[in-house]
């Protein structure tokens, strides 16, 4: 696939749980203020999108015991932002300073919990076809669904080994199915700045952790039992990594309260 001048370098993955009774106002605050004021107005932040896990989608998450969430019902909203390659340090410094400014200005929303807020280094991506959607456009495409897969490398294995397994074994089979993804990306955790907000959890075993984002042009729950419901066992069977989490999300509907009554 031809490379153009805009390339994804790093990404911000923010999974949050609004406190019950505050979900509607949280949703409105986030998309009408924080989505833009917290990230999108920043230099080198070239894309962003929001996803939601309804109650029925959370029921598909596994395993129940995961470092990603304290329990499967937690982590209803996911926001992601793309940062231009070569400008992570510039963006990161601005981002931390900006969020402190928003706190001081009273523009934050205390009735919510950060479940998993982590910066990731984008490593590689794989579209279904050679002329498919590049990762740089994934958040602008409005994919109907997203499946998040998380794992940790086992001793003696490298991220390159898992890339080869995904490219050569898992993806060719999945791309040919109705439940399979249109685009797969792979990322590894980055450290937060020392003065990042204290309520943002840090990642354990970061050097072995990986995040796969599987963008789907269909309902992510479709064909679950034969598809993503087996991803964990397939990853474990590869011998390369320990499976930590698989979870489906769907697009939010900007400007509406859609899905706020389906979270729990």
Predicted region positions:
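Macromolecular interaction modules
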Residues: 1-264
């Amino acid at each position: 696939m031809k490379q153009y001048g805009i390339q994804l370098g790093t990404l911000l993955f923010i999974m949050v749980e609004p406190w019950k009774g505050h979900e509607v106002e949280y949703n409105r605050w986030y998309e009408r203020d924080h989505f833009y004021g917290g990230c999108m107005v920043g230099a080198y932040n070239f894309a962003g999108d929001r996803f939601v896990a309804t109650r029925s989608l959370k029921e598909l998450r596994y395993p129940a015991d995961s470092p990603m969430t304290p329990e499967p019902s937690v982590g209803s909203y996911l926001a992601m932002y793309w940062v231009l390659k070569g400008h992570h340090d510039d963006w990161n410094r601005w981002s931390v300073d900006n969020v402190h400014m928003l706190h001081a200005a009273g523009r934050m929303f205390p009735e919510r919990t950060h479940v998993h807020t982590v910066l990731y280094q984008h490593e590689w991506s794989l579209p279904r076809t050679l002329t498919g959607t590049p990762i740089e456009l994934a958040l602008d495409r409005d994919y109907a669904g997203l499946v998040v897969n998380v794992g940790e490398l086992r001793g003696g294995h490298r991220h390159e080994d898992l890339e080869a397994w995904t490219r050569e074994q898992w993806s060719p089979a999945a791309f040919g199915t109705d439940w399979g993804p249109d685009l797969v990306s792979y990322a590894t955790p980055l450290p937060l700045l020392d003065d990042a907000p204290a309520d943002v959890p840090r990642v354990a075993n970061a050097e072995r952790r990986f995040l796969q984002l599987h963008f789907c042009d269909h309902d992510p729950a479709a064909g679950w039992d034969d598809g993503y419901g087996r991803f964990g066992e397939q990853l474990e069977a590869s011998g390369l990594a320990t499976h930590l989490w698989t979870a489906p999300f769907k697009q939010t509907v900007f400007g509406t309260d859609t899905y706020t009554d389906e979270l729990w």
